[in-house]
Structures are given as structure tokens and as C-alpha cells.
Amino acid sequence: MTTSTGKINLLGLTQPEMEQFFDSIGEKRFRAGQVMKWIHHFGVSDFAAMTNVGKVLREKLEAVAEIRPPEVVSEDISADGTRKWVIRVASGSCVETVYIPTDDRGTLCVSSQAGCALDCSFCSTGKQGFNSNLTAAEVIGQVWLANKSFGTVPAKVDRAITNVVMMGMGEPLLNFDNVIAAMKIMMDDLGYGISKRRVTLSTSGVVPMIDELAKHIDVSLALSLHAPNDELRNKLVPINKKYPLKVLLESCMGYMSTLGGKRVLTVEYTLLKDVNDQPEHAAQMIELLRDVPCKINLIPFNPFPHSGYERPSNNAIRRFQDLLHHGGFNVTTRTTRGDDIDAACGQLVGQVNDRTRRSERYIAVRQLSADVELPDSAASH
């Protein structure tokens, strides 16, 4: 992608795109691997630091290209070790990236959009509307910046980040091409070399793009379910009015079937007091998912101002988990992490600039979510 300087930002190029770039400037394709290693393995953003690249080529690159990550506005560290970065992107808006450490892994939660058009009623990101899609460089740049922050370069030595989840701000499948490109870089050995089983894309249910996904990439899939029936899900997750549960689950099953192997769908379910946390909801969920190979991740609601929802009691949370477990499901309840720095699930809000233009974009992308058409670049692969 060309930046405001008129130069190509190499940070967001996949390996084939990087090879094409070097072709276009009359250089050998093997240079793509050299430069990608400098960018992603060593966190270099200055061509002058690339010691195995000749001076003439470095000067040539300086003239036509750059390595420009998004800007870190702030970094907060929670008492539990969770980190949150506020990152400014080219649109002027800010997005948030969260790192969650546990005993055996370090998970980076990456944003795909500034704001979100899907307007899920319990999510603070949706309350701010939609501003812009992130570029591939801005998506993968969150991984690049986190590695730099931890000092884990080379990136594949004693890495802090073992897993990446596309569960930050935005609906990843409404930024299809850029998210796919970024995930390919995450998994490429010339990028971050993260296993495909450790890269997860979470969607609220953009069915045409789920159907398209397996043609482009093989990653783990998570579904933001949040309700066990269409009537309730229509209220909580409005895209359900376009793609109801039967169609949505068939699409998810189709994705897993196409890729083969022992695939398991991660089902995310935010528990809202007296809304979707009752025994009848658990019973409906057991019936809904009976034939779906899945694991269920319960997420107690993380309150934010004016949400209109409350977190269930610990007893209600345990009761719901026990009912699902007795129904034969592998169920975990997500421990709230980073809520003292507003980094918990559902709390990411960033900062969206230019509210009038944002509203226009919001309306446009809401229409897109209701009437999805594949982008030309997706259809041509």
C-alpha cells in the first residue's frame, strides 16, 4: 500500500507481494526474503540497518519504499500483567491492542477496524460506530510493535507472543483482504512463524465471507454467538437478522469441513445478567450445538458506562457452565484480565475522529454487512 509519502509500505506485504515489489524495481526476488526477515524477525524500520543489503539497493529502497508501523500513543500495564497499547492509524483514529499473558502462552488480541459497524448491543466498540478499515500494515504492525515493546527480536527467539487472536476492535471479515494478508505474514516463516492453529479469527457471522475464507487461508475459527436462539440474537447481534443461526452454523461447519482434520469451532458467549444466562438458555444452547464440534468459551460481561447490562453473579456463571458441561461440552469461563486498564473483552473503544464522516461510513458499512459482496481482489484469488 502507498502511504501519504507516496512510498510503498513494505511492512504489510506478504511474501508474494514482496517478490512482486522487487520485480517491479528490477531486483532479484531473493531480496524479498532478506528484507522480510529484517522487518519481522529483527524489528528493523530503517533500510540502513540491513547490513546484508548493498548500499546501492538500500538507497534505491529509501527512494521508493518505507517501513512504517502505526504510532503508539500510549501503553498501559495491568496489575495482572496484561498490556494495552493505544495505536493511532492513518485515518487519525486510535485502535487498541491487548497482550494477555498466561503460564503457557502469550496471546495478542489484534484490532482490524477503527470502530465497528455491527453494533452488537453489549460491546463498547460497536457503540462508537465505524470509521475505517485498517491496512494490512496497520494490522500486522500491531504484532510488530508488540514484539518491539517486549524486546523479543529476533521475533522467533524466546517469543513473548505465541498466539494471535483477531478479536480486537472491528469485524475482521468486513476487512477481508487486509486481515488475510496480515494473517499470512503472521504464519509465514519469513514473518512471525506462528502456527496456523495458534492464529484465530473471530467473527460475529458474516456468512458470505466465512464461505470464502477457506479459499484463502487456514486458521482457527471462533464464532461470537452470545445467544442460543434467533429472537435474542437479533437483539444482541443485529447481523443475525441477515444471517440467522441455522445458516451461520452451516457456514462454520462448511469452513471446518473444507479444510479437513480434527477441527473444533470456538464458540464465544458473553454472559449478561438476566438476559442470556438462565437455565433455559443453557438448554437451548446444548440443543443448538449438539452436532457442532466445538468448545465453548463463556465471557462474563465486562461493564462499561451506559451499557445497560450487568455482569451475572459468580453463582449464575458457575451454574451456566455446569449445565453446559453436563450437556457434554468442553466449557471454560474466561478470567477477566486487564479490566483496570479497560483492556477486558468488550471494553475496547479507541478513539474515532470526525464524527460526521464516521456516521456516513457507519451507514455505508452497515449496508455492506447486510448485503455483502466479495471484493474484486478476493474473488480473483
From Swiss-Prot:
S-adenosyl-L-methionine binds at residues 170-171, 202, 224-226, 302. The keyword Nucleotide-binding does not apply. Reaction proceeds by a ping-pong mechanism involving intermediate methylation of a conserved cysteine residue. Residues 102-342 form the Radical SAM core domain. This is Dual-specificity RNA methyltransferase RlmN. It comes from Pseudomonas putida (strain ATCC 47054 / DSM 6125 / CFBP 8728 / NCIMB 11950 / KT2440). GO terms for molecular function: 4 iron, 4 sulfur cluster binding; metal ion binding; rRNA (adenine(2503)-C2-)-methyltransferase activity; rRNA binding; tRNA (adenine(37)-C2)-methyltransferase activity; tRNA binding. PROSITE patterns: RADICAL_SAM (PS51918). Disulfide bonds join 109-345. Coiled coil: none annotated. Gene3D superfamilies: 1.10.150.530, Aldolase class I. One of its GO terms (biological process) is rRNA base methylation. PANTHER family: 23S RRNA METHYLTRANSFERASE (PTHR30544), RADICAL SAM CORE DOMAIN-CONTAINING PROTEIN (PTHR30544:SF5). It catalyses: adenosine(2503) in 23S rRNA + 2 reduced [2Fe-2S]-[ferredoxin] + 2 S-adenosyl-L-methionine = 2-methyladenosine(2503) in 23S rRNA + 5'-deoxyadenosine + L-methionine + 2 oxidized [2Fe-2S]-[ferredoxin] + S-adenosyl-L-homocysteine; adenosine(37) in tRNA + 2 reduced [2Fe-2S]-[ferredoxin] + 2 S-adenosyl-L-methionine = 2-methyladenosine(37) in tRNA + 5'-deoxyadenosine + L-methionine + 2 oxidized [2Fe-2S]-[ferredoxin] + S-adenosyl-L-homocysteine. Binds 1 [4Fe-4S] cluster. The cluster is coordinated with 3 cysteines and an exchangeable S-adenosyl-L-methionine. The keyword Metal-binding applies. Its EC number is 2.1.1.192. Specifically methylates position 2 of adenine 2503 in 23S rRNA and position 2 of adenine 37 in tRNAs. m2A2503 modification seems to play a crucial role in the proofreading step occurring at the peptidyl transferase center and thus would serve to optimize ribosomal fidelity.
